[in-house]
Amino acid sequence: MASQDKIRNIAIIAHVDHGKTTLVDEMLKQGGIYRENQATVERVMDSGDLERERGITILAKNTSVHYKDYKINIVDTPGHADFGGEVERILKMVNGVILLVDAAEGPMPQTRFVLQKALELGHKVIVAVNKVDKPDARIHEVMDEVLELLLDLDATDEQFNSPTIFCSGRQGTASYGPDEMGTDLTPLFETIVNYIDPPTGDENGPLQLLVSSIDYNEYVGRIAVGRIERGTIKVNQEVTICDFHDPEVKTKGKVVALYTFDGLGKAPVQTASAGEIVALSGMADITIGRTLCDPAAVEPLPFVKISDPTIEMTFAVNDSPFAGKEGKYVTSRNLRDRLEKELLKDVSLHVTEQGTDAFNVAGRGEMHLSILMEAMRREGYEFSVSTPRVLTREIDGKLCEPIERMVADVPEESMGAVIEKMGKRKGDLLGMTPVGSRYRLEFLVPSRGLFGYRNEFLTDTRGEGIMSSVLDSYAPMKGEIERRQVGSLIAFESGEACSYGLFNAQERGSLFIGPGTPVYAGMVVGICSRNEDMTVNVCKKKQLTNMRAAGSDEALRLTSPLIFSLEQCLEFLADDELLECTPKSLRIRKRELDHALRMRNLMKKRAQE
């Protein structure tokens, strides 16, 4: 077991897709994790299917590398602000951070969010400029941007004068200067060992361990992960579980199994001392933020307050005419059990029951909740969700809403369209700066102003724009924001879509379905080109008479249907619509399926206005 002065605990902070997980891969390879003949796995830290597909890290992962006689525990943090709950907890386990910045893009909003948390905790920072071998790298400008960011976030003198390493994660090289060419990652390892402090804590004192994350295993149940702040922990040791914010919580527990992180896996150990990051099992009701103490000295540790959720959706049992046909888990009990299981691992999530068949699920952003929905679909769940709603707060007697700092990198010819659209969505332009051949626009915009904007943004920038946002503050409500400039095409009757019916319907807008697709009355089958809903009969067949030959149907030319992803469906949803999620399909539908009732409700609403 490594002694305390030979341990370094670090977290890697980076924006989505700046190469964090790839760099960790190279550190593992050069740290000798893989045997000579062992097949290496690309992006080992992104172990979930969704993470590999989307190229993002959702849950923070722990791993360790051996360099000389040092053990470096590396914690990979999510770069997306929607998973900020993960980030804040993880920073409590480490003594320093590596700020990884793309040599072309520079620091981005999510980087700012996590770095601010790290600086507040007083962590030392190593700046790593990654992808220096890219043809569009702007190394010197990016270094200036990092210094400006550190100044902006009130970094201390020591944090401001952080060492900088220049690396290429893909090639596995690092150097001390921007013009030098490294051969391996030795400069990075040396900087970590010499600059980051070893963990402190009295190995001989009474035990204190703060649980920073929870893993779940079908065989051993909950696995608590955290750093030992003080003392030593042993297998079969009796402990007291307490909570800093809730003095009433005091339960007894026993350490059944104890592991340290070794390379990519967990290594079982009999004992571990202060400074080490460990995983332990045996306590069924352990949760994030609790402290494990020696029963003779119960002293809970303070816990990083996790930011509140900003958006909410209603998850409900699917009650459409196609309910139960494609899913394996379809009842409210299945839905409740699955959401409760997610709460075990995700502290940023809040779930409240809304009647018998519905649950309000609040999270840190659309992406946070869409990842959960996609995971549930893949596991065989069937459910419906409402349009996202922002969670407001009352501050000094005024109703306030979340405001996001949005940064967009766009081609020069798209600037006008983006600024105009953001103005309509109550966004305030903070500044524009040229970045290479493009412009970086920075806005403060209400969270609800960004609902449904990503698709429009990609259209306006012809797919070349990059946008990201992070929660900035709360401000008084900014008034009505128009969500959608188009209406829905709604199926008039249940049946199977036919070429003849679709051909007539496509004149009214763009369709989501092709011939042979089963539909039901009230299902949204396309986008109406006007700003109003329109009912169409896509099941209509051509009447066969002597005058109308069946063969002439072959001449009908149908445009290809639009296929929406889960995020695009959520962005398209109107307030009176639901998204039906099943393992095989995503269907948008009206809350009220009956056409006559919908029209009656619309008349009532107009009369009240």
Enumerate the language-model features and the residues they cover:
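P-loop NTPase switch module centered on the Walker A-proximal segment
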Residues: 1-101, 105, 145, 214-217
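Conserved structured catalytic cores and adjacent interaction surfaces
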Residues: 5-19, 81, 104-116, 122-124, ...
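Residue-level signature of catalytic and energy-coupling elements of molecular machines
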Residues: 17, 23, 55, 74-76, ...
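Interdomain boundary/hinge elements
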Residues: 39-42, 127, 153-165, 199-210, ...
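Canonical P-loop GTPase G-domain recognition
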Residues: 124, 134-194
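Conserved nucleotide-binding/hydrolysis modules and their immediate coupling elements
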Residues: 208-313, 321-325, 486, 495-545, ...
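Long insertion/accessory domains within large nucleic-acid-processing enzymes
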Residues: 261, 266-269, 400, 445, ...
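A short, contiguous, amphipathic alpha-helix enriched in charged residues
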Residues: 320-343, 555, 559
